[in-house]
A protein has these predicted regions:
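Alpha/propeptide regions of enzymes that mature by internal proteolysis
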Residues: 1-131
Length: 131
């Protein structure tokens, strides 16, 4: 997942889609099938790899989800890489935002429902993990 988050061609991490206000708020979740443990984060703005933070939530906290400033604070406390929010922005995503705003149509198209970037894996012993 970190490879996808670091690649500006994907809409997770660097290259994330902007909010209507022109900011990037990132989400990530992870689940481990054997233990059924899960961790997730929402509205992260400073954590370079939100999937790493979701894993920390799963492994190092009593919570299943953290959001916003509290999630970024937890990330910094756990020593995860922090970046300026501008790190996530790309010219292509900014162009897409401006194109959508110029159309002056509904921001949410009910016919175009897409999820986030995801990955699943099965180990040699049949253990399944998803992120």
């Amino acid at each position: 997942m970190k490879v996808l988050e670091d690649d500006p061609n994907y809409n997770a991490g660097r290259g994330a889609v902007f909010t209507h206000d022109g900011t990037n708020e990132l989400d990530a979740s992870i689940m481990e099938g054997t233990t059924r443990k899960a961790g997730s984060v929402a509205g992260v703005t400073r954590t370079k790899n939100p999937i790493s933070l979701a894993r920390k939530v799963m492994e190092d906290s009593p919570h299943v989800m953290l959001a916003g400033r509290g999630a970024d604070q937890f990330s910094a406390e756990k020593g995860l890489a922090q970046v300026d929010p501008s790190y996530f922005a790309t010219e292509e995503r900014r162009r897409q935002l401006e194109t959508l705003k110029a159309k002056k149509t509904s921001w949410f198209d009910v016919d175009r429902k897409f999820g986030t970037v995801g990955a699943g894996a099965m180990g040699a012993k049949g253990h399944v993990a998803a992120a």
